[in-house]
Amino acid sequence: MSDSANQQFQAWLEQIRGIGGPNPLTNLDTEVAGLVNLERAHPVGLSLFTRSHRGLLANLVRDPISYSKALTEAKRAKIKSDRLEANFGLETLYLLAGAVDFRHLKLDRRIPIVLWQAELIRKGADFELALTGDPIVNPELILTLKYEFNINLDVPRLLRLYTESTDLAPITLLSFVAEQTKSVPELEIQRTLVVTNATYAPTLMLHDIKRPNSLVEELATGVVPDRHHDKDLIPLIPADADQEQTQVITRVLNGESFAVETLPGTGYTQTVANILGALAGESKRALVLAPRRQTLNELVPYEDTYLPLR
């Protein structure tokens, strides 16, 4: 990869790291808005919640002042969770248990250990907190230990210890992580238990494109090799398209990998609809991804008009 392409590639990696702003899965800050701190939850309420995986916030936080703050932060987390799910299809509400602090190593990260997907369900003036699915180990912790310190975390054993415990932030979990990372004594293993909005999608994206390929280099340099196509190929499209749009559709039908940069109002939505129609005409399927649900909704009228038998 050329120097210019590598610089562009590194810039893209930095942009991916910044997706969504500060990420509690890479640097947990317990003082931010939209975070319910359960580290000092009432022992009885926490014990019942640990067994049933459901509980009212009022039972978990019984001090009036602390409960008022927890209720306010739960409302913020709920609003943000609903917005991210509606607009981007992301489920972002998690219980985070335990943390590893890397800051003594001049690495600005405080990474939670275990994630457990959660729900906040309105119950009158209160919220019911519910845990769903199974807990997972934070991918950011696994990858940071592997690439920064050559430590392979025993994920199955860690999860087994966690699920067998009667606590949501058990000493056995913290002790096991300390044992696994004993080659780096500067690491600080901390007991934390919070509910907040988080997603590990940027982490997976970042490491998924760690090794650039020819497509990445073409995108980074803007230099695309000549493509040889059958000039007589005329795609079957359901709506009008100019010459450039037709070329894009033709390249899709030829199975090429490429990106198109355009401005709003230049017909990109209709071009996508034409691509879907052309693929349908060849009995092919297509998966359409978009950063916002609104973008997908804009395609619906075209589908109703051009693809009534979908």
What are these regions (language model features)?
Residues M1-D242:
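Extended, charged low-complexity regulatory segments
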Residues T295-R310:
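Conserved helix-turn-beta segment of the N-terminal RecA-like "Helicase ATP-binding" lobe
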Residues N254-I275:
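Walker A/P-loop
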Residues A201, L206-H207, N254-V260, K284:
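Pre-Walker A (Motif I) flank of P-loop NTPase domains
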Residues I121-G124, L279-K284, T305-L309:
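Secondary-structure transition/capping motifs at alpha-helix termini
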Residues Y268-T271, I275-L299:
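Conserved RecA-like ASCE P-loop NTPase motor core of nucleic-acid helicases/translocases
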Residues I237-L253:
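N-terminal pre-P-loop "Q-motif" helix
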